[in-house]
């Protein structure tokens, strides 16, 4: 009788573990720096890391389709040669990869004048409808550089702003808030149709959760506590910052994704503010959906960053998934594991 009970218990435990695994999927946000062309061997490194990590979804930033090519199709072909089947569609500036068949795709914010873009796919993951968005938001009027004494459009040295209002005025001169408002509108439509939402992207703007009273005198924040626009809009609309949900303290887990160190590139080519500490968490994965939960999050890339034109190893409690070979970009990526709990 005891043996039967033990066998039943083990069987139930196994089924429970398997059901948890069945509900899990991973999302990789990755700015690939001009399709990896800025780093020798960069494209092959992108493919090799996807083969290693096998994420369910990849949200790319800086897709360029050089010489009238189709980057997404090229990636699918390269992965197929290595025995992996992924799905995608033509896009520019941002891109999407999916392990799961894509049932629909949409341009939410088309690229125009290099002010960023947002695309969306629909897919089903283990019976759950998922809408995955990729965003590369406007890099101009990049106001966190103004705080550090650099113009956020020309990157020339300027006097530092004295008020938060000055900073936010520059910030909203960009098209980042316009793009994210369109995302929110479309995402609400998708949710009304039963979809859970994932948004991965390089926002080119920090989080209001990272510029607090506790760190206002760190990282060249210039004593400022700033309610950055894009993440505030997302949070007000019910979207959850996966990294900050898991690691709520920016002192212990700042989660910097830019500028990443890259040993194949000289430090002066990795910085836009050579005299400043410009480290920021600008690559995000936000989400919202019934029964959807972020389980794990890890920074993907080198453990060192660029600070005042120097390579500096991070000493925070952030967890890193180090690259196996060539690092193809000047950003760090973000890999998040999600699970459906119902």
State what each model feature region is:
Residues 35-37, 65-69, 115-116, 140-143, ...:
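Active-site environment of divalent metal-dependent phosphoester hydrolases
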Residues 39, 63-151, 296-300:
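Structured beta-strand-rich core segments of catalytic domains in phosphoester-bond hydrolases
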Residues 25-32, 46-69, 132-135, 166-214, ...:
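Active-site beta-strand/loop signature of hydrolases that rely on acidic residues for catalysis
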Residues 34-41, 59-60, 141-144, 208, ...:
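Short, solvent-exposed loop/turn elements at domain surfaces
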Residues 122, 188-198, 204-342:
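Metal-dependent phosphoester-hydrolase catalytic domains
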Residues 54, 99-101, 238:
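Residue-level detector of structured alpha->beta connecting loops
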Residues 2-5, 15-82, 280, 320-321, ...:
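N-terminal, active-site-proximal structural segment of metallo-dependent hydrolase catalytic domains
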Residues 145-173, 214-216:
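A solvent-exposed, charged loop/short amphipathic helix patch at secondary-structure junctions
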